[in-house]
Amino acid sequence: MRRLLSPLFAALIVGVTVLTAPSTSWAYPFWAQQNYDSPREATGKIVCANCHLAQKLTQAEVPQSVLPDSVFKAVVKIPYDTSVPEIGADGSEVPLQVGAVVMLPDGFTLAPQDRWTDDIKEETEGVYFSEYSDDQPNVILVGPIPGDQHQEIVFPVLSPDPATDSNIHFGKYSIHVGGNRGRGQVYPTGEKSNNTVFTAPSTGTVRSIEAGENGASVVTIASADGTELSETVPVGPALIVSVGDAVEAGAPITNDPNVGGFGQLDTEVVLQNPVRIYGLLAFFAAVALAQIMLVLKKKQFEKVQAAEGV
């Protein structure tokens, strides 16, 4: 029941926020959740990159190894210059939001809150986690949340226990991480947002630039054969052409207002067998004891030699 309510609650939060704050700059892992069965394509690309076209650095920190049934932190870092705003849906300057997705190995899940340490509770304050879907509890989403407060997002992760799940085995596992800052350039419907470059629809001369609806500009280009095509530029991007300018098809007619972007990476974690650790510790103890015995034996031998006057 809790898993069912989590995505519904996330949808309610996003829906209310969209209606009440249309000018805010969003990073929407939620949209990927609604449009793709899996957040990762067969090629390895995380689907967020289909809407967030700019590539930006994303980093991740996870322990090298973890024990079964233990809670550890997977930290996703989404660095960017917080002093630079971007263009909101209404054309105003707004601070960037961030979002992240962590695809854990099968069996690894978001740790239950009753197992969070005080440090984890403090580090995750203001962060809401949701599972990608009911049948993928190992895929965890965060966002959108204010980027200036969350350039590092801590994911509390619970490791599985092979002793209670026969499908889980000790060994090395891959973790896929994606991090985004700012709005996308394309909506899931395929339409451009106002956070991207607009280009000339044909080769020709800019015949007119007229005001459109909601602050948009309609740029009309006349081809050499007299054909006219128009491109509607929404409020936000700045025009870089004027009436009478010659343009090539596909050439930019606006600046690029986007300052955000998406990045992904793969990392690894080892689910360590505690018996091997105990065996290793016992081996180290045996080696240390053997060295001590050798030292004591050597000193005893030296004393005997000294007593015999050798």
Swiss-Prot record:
One record GO biological process: photosynthesis
Subcellular location: Cellular thylakoid membrane
Job of this protein: Component of the cytochrome b6-f complex, which mediates electron transfer between photosystem II (PSII) and photosystem I (PSI), cyclic electron flow around PSI, and state transitions.
Record PANTHER family: CYTOCHROME F, PTHR33288
Entry protein name: Cytochrome f
Top-rank taxon: Bacteria
Transmembrane segments: 277-297
Organism for this UniProt entry: Synechococcus sp. (strain WH7803)
Family: Belongs to the cytochrome f family.
NCBIfam families: PRK02693.1
Lineage, opening ranks: Bacteria, Bacillati, Cyanobacteriota, Cyanophyceae, Synechococcales
Binding site for heme: Y28, C48, C51, H52
Transmembrane helix is among the record's keywords: yes
Membrane-related topology note: Single-pass membrane protein
GO cellular component, one term: plasma membrane-derived thylakoid membrane
Cofactor(s) of this protein: heme
Signal peptide boundaries: 1-27
Alphabetic keyword roster: Electron transport, Heme, Iron, Membrane, Metal-binding, Photosynthesis, Signal, Thylakoid, Transmembrane, Transmembrane helix, Transport
Iron recorded as keyword: yes
